[in-house]
Amino acid sequence: MATVINPPRDPNTLSNYNNWVSIHITANFDILFDQKKLAGNVVHRFRSTTRGESRDIILDTNHLDIGGVKVNGQPSSWEFLPRLEPYGTPLKIKLDQAVELDETIEVDISVTTTEKCTALQWLTPAQTSNKKHPYMFSQCQAIHARSIFPCQDTPDVKCTLDFNITSPLPVIASGLPVRKQPETSKSEGKSLYQFHQKVPIPSYLFALASGDISEASIGPRSVVATSPDKLRECQWELEADTEKFINAIEKIVYPYVWGEYNVLILPPSFPYGGMENPIFTFATPSIISKDRENIDVIAHELAHSWSGNLVTNASWEHFWLNEGWTTYLERRVSDASVHGEPYRHFSAIIGWKALTDSMDHFGHDHDFTKLITNLKGKDPDDAFSSIPYEKGFNFLYYLETLVGKSKFDDFIPHYFNKFKGKSLDSYEFKATILDFFQADSEAAKALNEVDWDKWFYAPGLPPKPDFDTSLVDVVYDLAKKWLSLPGSSFKPQPNDIRGLSANQIVVFLEQVLVSEHQLTPELSRLMGEVYGLARSNNIEVANLYCQVGMKAGDESVLEPTIELLGKIGRMKFVRPLYRNLQKFNRQRAIETFQEYKDFYHPICRAMVEKDLFGKKEE
């Protein structure tokens, strides 16, 4: 009988997932706030994908304490293999007997996290909004689940999950909550919280949070969860659009499969805009801008319920399949279906600016500017940028324009049905779209003429589409007027920006920021005063105005910049602010980072250290 060989597709895991596949995990954890640890056990059900040839199960771990391993209820021998940076320490579990193809075994691992865990952030009461209780949350993407529990930490493996979590404070997890009164142990003051995830998910979507959390309805299948003192304002921000977004995307793809769609608004040190943890999107409080202008983050994370969470990139080298598709769907939903087609183009223009910024950061010939990256031996976090989002979006938009929007609309549900519950790479995507359109001679001809290799492997910017600029022309004109000063007769008035959306003001500030013409410090200060920019509740606006001011050498933005850096941990804002601050006043940049580094999430802290010091500080 021939040996079964299943080549692994993911270079960022040390597990032998080509021989064993985890099909269900039960996670039993006690949240120990005093020790800043999770302690408990995880039970994997593994299916053999060989004919008894593999007698070892190798799992990813990173800085974990293992208490013991049982296989089918019996103690089993195990060992740590040599550590390999940046992937951690493989855990090798020995099996006493062969397991035939498609047979399953149960592996129970006793585990405690350590202070070196990269997936968890522990906040003191002082770091929360109402300053009453400690708080913890996880961020497992891309390869941080392995620092919570031993697993096959790859998006190429998906399994169902049960969570049994004990905590003195309310718990959120990436499963459907069992909505009954949690059982409380009177002696310890802790309660058991249970969640079930019946849709198979990859390890990076394992999520936990616990703290002083309350919930309020934002739709017929949705709640927002956050600190009690912020609950009303978060509810107001999200209740008008959440169900509208779900309905819009269901029309484009197919019905939502996860049961509930909820949003957890985290404390301000959360490093991303949002994380698409199933059933509970984790989101930054920076979207709560009191004007409902920043909730495109919710449209984006909701779109992940189809692209990414149901249909997943097989490895982080093909990350554009998650993020390019999600950005495409987000713009079809929050922009085209809610605001109209010109708004989709307006968002794409904002995205193009983010794309060029990322290209400039890496260098236009860098490997990380390709659609398909080479991550062998690399940390996927180092490649994280807007490139997979925006270059991916532009590729899909290009394909849409080639075949026509209505035909592309027929392809969308076909694609998401074909790979529902599966992981795929770029080559399978290419084969699928070519196959779908092969009977349509016109579309097939156009797709066969696409330079696929150039799109997949060429570094740098793709061709720029011919976007509808109607919503940006007015702010381009306003930027030109400012850049004509002091040599023109333009007199800035508050009326200049009346009627503009916050996102239009963002584009205005970006135009000023990228111009080779530099504002004087006096003009920068005037802009802030006349338009009220430094005082804006909308952090997208306030952060860009601070960058404009620093570029102009305007000392008046120094304190607002430092204040912003002390109250938000979202990398989208923190990293550019530090990069600009160090050019403006390196000493203050370093002092500010030293003051606030414990406020930032470990992922954010490591990235800013690289930005400021060139490499991670020891």
UniProtKB/Swiss-Prot annotation:
It catalyses: an epoxide + H2O = an ethanediol. The keyword Cytoplasm applies. The keyword Nucleus applies. A peptide binds at Q139, C140, Q141, P271, Y272, G273, G274, M275, E276. One of its GO terms (biological process) is lipid metabolic process. SUPFAM superfamilies: ARM repeat, Leukotriene A4 hydrolase N-terminal domain, Metalloproteases ('zincins'), catalytic domain. GO terms for cellular component: cytosol; fungal-type vacuole lumen; multivesicular body; nucleus; NVT complex. Gene3D superfamilies: 3.30.2010.30, Neutral Protease Domain 2, Peptidase M1, leukotriene A4 hydrolase/aminopeptidase C-terminal domain, tricorn interacting facor f3 domain. The active site is at E301, Y389. One of its GO terms (molecular function) is metallopeptidase activity. It comes from the Eukaryota. Binds 1 zinc ion per subunit. Its EC number is 3.4.11.-, 3.3.2.10. It is found in: Cytoplasm; Nucleus. Keywords: Cytoplasm, Hydrolase, Metal-binding, Metalloprotease, Nucleus, Protease, Zinc. InterPro entries: Aminopeptidase_N-like_N, Aminopeptidase_N-like_N_sf, ARM-type_fold, LTA4H, LTA4H_cat, M1_LTA-4_hydro/amino_C_sf, M1_LTA4H, Peptidase_M1. Zn(2+) binds at H300, H304, E323. Its cofactor is Zn(2+). Aminopeptidase that preferentially cleaves di- and tripeptides. Also has low epoxide hydrolase activity (in vitro). Can hydrolyze the epoxide leukotriene LTA(4) but it forms preferentially 5,6-dihydroxy-7,9,11,14-eicosatetraenoic acid rather than the cytokine leukotriene B(4) as the product compared to the homologous mammalian enzyme (in vitro). PANTHER family: LEUKOTRIENE A-4 HYDROLASE. Belongs to the peptidase M1 family. This is Leucine aminopeptidase 2.
